[in-house]
From Swiss-Prot:
Motif DEAH box per record, residues: 498-501
Signal sequence annotation: none
Similarity comment: Belongs to the helicase family. Yeast subtelomeric Y' repeat subfamily.
Note: Present with 279 molecules/cell in log phase SD medium.
The Helicase ATP-binding domain, residue ranges: 375-552
Entries under Pfam families matching the protein: DEAD, Sir1
SUPFAM superfamilies named in the record: P-loop containing nucleoside triphosphate hydrolases
Binding, ATP: 388-395
An MF annotation (GO) of this entry: nucleic acid binding
Top-level taxonomy: Eukaryota, Fungi, Dikarya, Ascomycota, Saccharomycotina
Protein name: Uncharacterized helicase-like protein YBL111C
């Protein structure tokens, strides 16, 4: 808003503007809520001058004694003439109303005053001392909540970009009172700016169930509690949905379009609007804050210990059946497995996916690769293991089906890929996300925030797969999705594990893999295990080590594909089908791999000769050297530094050191 436009707006919404600004006090009472709704507020300190008795603003040069006698107000700053500044403070019935929290050892009261006033537009909320321990968390962890709000606005931007023709988020927002622009088009460059403003509101909504501010609005009724709507309406300033601040305007169009994010963000409006307008016709709530807090916690993925309870919706038959069940059965963790509704699929989906990824000239390398890709995408085989040589195209065996799944408009599939080492993550994510065919993100995002509704494939390492937080989220997937997105069309797709033989061969890491046995494999559409060096004995032992049945007794050749029987028992109840593409006399057409087996007297010397020859011909190339022991890794790295720029890593390094090496490889 231009300075001239702002001054016109100030005068139009404050009838006594001229006379009030001629007041000698720096602090001036203003009854216009519209002015405070439309112009950014700030918190300033004021004091009463002993000599003149006037209210003056505390400036940097004001003496220490004046600051000690000061008090704080939420104000709108206005300019009188060229160099004179006045501050307007909002008042209702009482002049110079002072409300808000009591002093705290954690926070100065102005911060909470500003947060509560801006979010709820309420002047009568009171906090007790216990609330300060909760409210202080925002300022102690502000960076964390800032990042959460950034991601919420990024989600808004993604939705708006996908629907530029009907989304008001890509147009200029206009204040419905003054008709002047408030926020221009939401852009990537402004997400962080607005995210900082959204963070306090998000914090309050996430923690509102821990605060005492709404406890006074509970009216006891026979057998249950209900919101005292009359008292709430007296305390809350009546606002229209269109008079909210810009963070709610951002999602206004999406709410009209019934978008999932907008539906969740609408809880911010419900807090400030009249709750339960018609009393008896509205649903009865345990607490006013419970619904709001629950919805936000679920959508933002902060419910690591959350388990949905459907006890309130169970019918009489369910209760009787539950009481009749044996105690032994009750102690077991029951897994609900069922036939999943299959979306229409065809072999043409794979061909279309290949052309998206590689261009119109795409062709499969051989018939084996074609048939196995169709097996993974089309067949009901719940668990598949593939052994193929390096360079054969194992990645495409699941990459193309994932792209085909992502093309299904009536269902959203979320898949997971796990690799053994951190150093493989960056390149893997780049490869799988090229050409924008898939939305790829780290598994750490899923663990920390939950499903964002946008990502098609999460990529992580074995440690992520074994973590308790990951297994808990998968176990509660269907309940969380149903509560968060209010649909069953967001499904778990593939669980893909690369180089799965490491579960058996890496003895020193086996203690880290124990948590994988707690994973609910039945929740996934299909499990895919890949390796270049996993003979049947190793593959069978590796699968059993993570809690699966193991390989089918009879090894399946690639030419013996057939559909499996009914899947009602779940993925973990069936043996894994093994497809071996490495045969003694087969000639697999590898596109870019040249393999040589050599017996030499000194392996390090021979390896050094090969590397020197390689970099002489191709100076920009890179090479990976695998050593048999950790000591040999460090020795080779030290001795070869005079020839090459070396980045080295082995399993005994800590996470921090691995991260440094990972960055070095990416660089």
């Amino acid at each position: 808003m231009k300075v001239s436009d702002r001054r016109k707006f100030e005068k139009a919404n404050f009838d006594e503007f001229e006379s009030a600004l001629n007041n000698k006090n720096d602090l001036v009472h203003c009854p216009s809520i519209t002015l405070f709704e439309s112009i950014p507020t700030e918190v300033r300190s004021f004091y009463e001058d002993e000599k003149s008795g006037l209210i003056k603003v505390v400036k940097f040069r004001t003496g220490a004694m004046d600051r000690k006698r000061s008090f704080e107000k939420i104000v709108v700053s206005v300019m009188v003439g060229k160099n004179v500044q006045k501050f307007l403070t909002f008042v209702e019935d009482e002049p110079d109303f002072q409300g808000g929290p009591i002093p705290s050892k954690y926070l100065i009261p102005k911060k909470i005053n500003l947060m509560v006033y801006t979010l709820f537009q309420v002047h009568t909320l009171k906090f007790n001392r216990k609330d300060y321990d909760t409210l202080s968390l925002f300022y102690l962890n502000r960076g964390y909540y800032n990042e959460l709000s950034f991601r919420v606005l990024e989600r808004c931007y993604e939705i708006a970009s996908a629907r530029p023709n009907d989304s008001s988020t890509m147009r200029t927002f206009t204040d419905f009172v003054s008709g002047t622009p408030i926020v221009r088009s939401l852009q990537k460059s402004t997400i962080r700016k607005y995210g900082y403003n959204l963070a306090p509101y998000m914090f309050l909504l996430l923690h509102v169930d821990e605060l005492s501010i709404f406890s006074a609005y509970q009216a006891s009724l026979p057998g249950e509690k209900k919101v005292d709507t009359e008292r709430l309406k007296r305390d809350l300033c009546p606002r229209k949905p269109t008079e909210i601040k810009y963070f709610s305007q951002i999602c206004n169009d999406m709410m009209n379009k019934k978008d999932r994010l907008g539906d969740v963000l609408a809880t911010a409006q419900r807090i400030r609007r009249r709750y339960n307008k018609n009393g008896s016709s509205e649903p009865r709530l345990k607490t006013l804050d419970g619904l709001t807090s629950e919805r936000w916690i679920q959508w933002l993925g902060l419910e690591s210990d959350y388990h949905c309870s459907f006890s309130s919706t169970r019918n009489a038959e369910d209760v009787v059946a539950g009481e009749a069940a044996s105690s032994d059965h009750d102690q077991k963790i029951s897994r609900v497995t069922r036939k999943r509704p299959r979306e229409p699929k065809s072999t043409n989906d794979i061909l279309v996916a290949g052309r998206k990824l590689f261009g119109s000239s795409f062709e499969f390398r051989d018939l084996h690769q074609l048939r196995l890709c169709h097996e993974i995408y089309m067949a009901d085989t719940p668990s598949v293991a593939v052994q193929a040589p390096p360079g054969y195209g194992k990645t495409e065996l699941f990459h193309l089906p994932l792209i085909a799944l992502a093309s299904k408009g009536d269902v959203k599939y979320v898949s997971f890929l796990f690799v053994p080492y951190t150093v493989l993550l960056a390149n893997c994510m780049i490869r799988l996300g090229r050409r924008g065919c898939l939305n790829v993100a780290p598994v750490r995002n899923f663990i920390e925030e939950g499903c964002d509704g946008v990502t098609d494939l999460y990529v992580g390492i074995y440690d992520d797969l074994a973590s308790t937080n990951f297994t808990d989220r998968i176990a509660a997937w269907e309940n969380i999705v149903e509560c968060t997105f209010r649909t069953n069309n967001v499904k778990l797709g593939y669980l893909i594990v690369d180089e799965f033989h490491n579960f058996e061969t890496e003895v020193y890491r086996q203690s880290q893999f124990g948590g994988i046995t707690n994973l609910d494999f039945d929740a996934f559409e299909k499990a895919i295990f890949l390796s270049g060096t996993a003979p049947e004995a190793v593959a069978d032992a590796a699968l059993q080590r993570i809690g699966l049945t193991g390989l089918a007794k009879k090894s399946m050749d690639i030419n013996e594909l057939k559909r499996s029987e009914d899947l009602s028992r779940g993925l973990s109840s069936y043996p894994t089908r093994m497809f071996n593409l490495i045969k003694e006399k087969s000639e697999v057409p590898l596109g870019h791999v040249h393999k040589i087996w050599k017996k030499v007297e000194s392996q390090p010397e021979e390896a050094l000769k090969l590397l020197l020859a390689l970099f002489e011909i191709e100076p920009e190339s890179k090479a990976i050297v695998v050593a048999s022991t950790t000591n040999e890794v460090e020795e080779l790295a030290c001795s070869w530094r005079k020839y090459f720029r070396v980045v080295w890593i082995h399993g005994k390094l800590g996470c921090c050191r691995k991260g440094v090496s990972h960055k070095g490889v990416c660089h």
